Amino acid sequence: MTTVLTTPEIKAIDKIRGHRFNPPKKQVEKIPALYATEQTPTADKIAHLHFFSGNADWYVFELDPETGLAFGWAELLPGCGEWGYFNLIELAELHVNGRVIERDGWFDPTPVAELKELR
């Protein structure tokens, strides 16, 4: 499995972020491939990663580590979340007015049924 979740821009912004945006390789290897959980009931789907900036949250349930394309839950405004696809490389490279998107280093894989944010 090849991972291209690092670019020169991401490395530079990581200095602002104060930590690596990208999760450890062992963690990435445990995330199901895109479409792998289509038949899994929503309550049983596992969020493997959590990213945030201000009130915005992104939860990763499936990932293509070669392209950075992820499937998951994104809530950019409170109460306005939806399931869909987003690109982790694009999120990692965002830097607007000193704000960046951060990876929640304390987040453990969690089923939807246990994520109060998604209920």
Describe the role of every protein-language-model region.
Residues M1-G54, E117-R119:
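N-terminal domain-onset segments
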Residues H19, L49-H50, Y59, G84, ...:
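Short non-domain terminal segments
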Residues F61-H95:
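Acidic, aromatic-enriched beta-alpha/helix-loop junctions
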Residues G81-R119:
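Helix-rich interaction surfaces within compact, conserved domain-sized segments
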